[in-house]
Amino acid sequence: MRTKQDFINALSKMKRNIYYDGQLIDRTDELQSDCINVMGTTYDEAAKPENEVLMTATSHLTGQKINRFTHIHQNTTDLHRKQDMTRMLCQKVGGCIQRCMGIDGTNAIYNVSFEADKVKPGETNYHENFKKWLTRFQKEDMIAACAQTDTKGDRMLRPAEQPDPSAYVRIKERTKDGIIVEGCKLHISEASVSDEVLVIPTRALRKEDKDYAVAFAVPADYDGMKQVVTIHNYRQREHFKRGFTPGLTDSYLIFDNCFVPWERVFLAGEHLYGGVLALLFALFHRHSYSGCKPAIGDVILGTAALAAECNNVHKESHVREKLAELIMTIELGYAAGYTASDLGKPEVYIPGMGFVPFGPGSYIPNSIYCNVGRCLSGEAVWREAEILCDIAGGVVATFPHEKDFVNPDVGPALLKYTKRNPKMSAEDQAQFWRYLGDSMCSATGGIANVGNYHGGGSPIMEQIAITTQYDIESRKKLVKFIAGMSGGDREALAPKVKK
């Protein structure tokens, strides 16, 4: 396994294909340093002996010790540890750990490539291609961005109906050596600090959309792909540094007649599996959210409690009620993810068929509980922000800049007049309000809230998944029996025992 410095050294050797604010930049540009430090945490923590069980695994391909972020889940224990690893790391960086796209993308492709090879037995080699790619990915402890979201063009038209065929990433041409693709993937988190980019479909596809059923991997500095990155950093401080300063990036990935050799292609035209891959990545990513969002909730809870303490209202009953509400949201989201892990099996939900065996045997979290947990947590994002705003008051929006506090003309007076709790130092109170201003009243803080709401799938997507997969009809039959109506069935929800 590599170190954080190995990771940075690898970034420094990559070709320049990243545009920021109109200019080409290096991956190790200072603007990306906060994001790199977040990603680097996944290497620093994996090297600690106390984190070995949580952060490392044994590769089922090579038998070697690997970083868990490169692992394919082999049992429910792996699913539990992935959730707990994600929560632990997100706590340490105060937000998104950024590396989950890779583990979620690899687990989805691992399963779908196996099934897609059954469409034309002997004619495709998707699964073996992916296993070869994955072996190197694990051995070199690499980071992968997962590029799913297409530009989509006219939202009322399907991919093959678009006036611009590149509104969704598509196979433009097939050759004996590979495929040529064009299109753009957007909102791609941390592609600017990744070694590889995994590309997968974004939606269900029909037969006429088969050219859009494509999955492949390319190096993040690959010829034929350009990145346009947006970098999200908090305001830099000169005098009153944070304990840890996270940063985020997201990229538009432009594929311009990009050639991909067959050995890096994991799906090419099997339209039914394009939709399955889109949904399966979303499922794994929502499972990651059940570790990520509780950790962010832990940070929000601590922030709300400290805001109340700084304001010296921490003993008031309305504060206790709000803290209890935060705790319930945190732990319900985690509990749903825990249950999804515990009920994980090598199976997926297929409409009209229910849960069926899927893939070569790796474990997939239960989709109902993944979606329930993600939806509950996602819908709570703005309520959590409201609670912080309510407890903090207006000071968070109007707090003076740090250099005012070191100006001898006004600094001492500012410390005096911003102190609220006589039992807490004025310096600590000022430092807290600076931190909360970063979280609540900055562009990056706003972006984080939007990401927490939409990341892994907007709540409406979870609601669709829940209502299509949940057995509502059996509940109706049970109630018909209880009510004395025709068509009732007292045993509608009784456990089905296999003989």
Specify the residue positions occupied by each region the protein language model found.
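A structural signal for well-ordered alpha-helices, especially hydrophobic packing surfaces
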Residues: 39, 43-46, 308, 330, ...
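Alpha-helix capping/hinge segments and adjacent helical runs
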Residues: 368-498
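Short, charged, amphipathic alpha-helical segments
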Residues: 320-324, 357-371
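Glycine-rich flavin
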Residues: 57-196, 202-216, 221, 226
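Acidic/polar, glycine-rich intrinsically disordered N-terminal extensions of enzymes
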Residues: 1-59
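FAD-binding core of flavoproteins
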Residues: 146, 151-292, 473, 477-498
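Extended amphipathic alpha-helical segments enriched in small hydrophobics
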Residues: 288-347
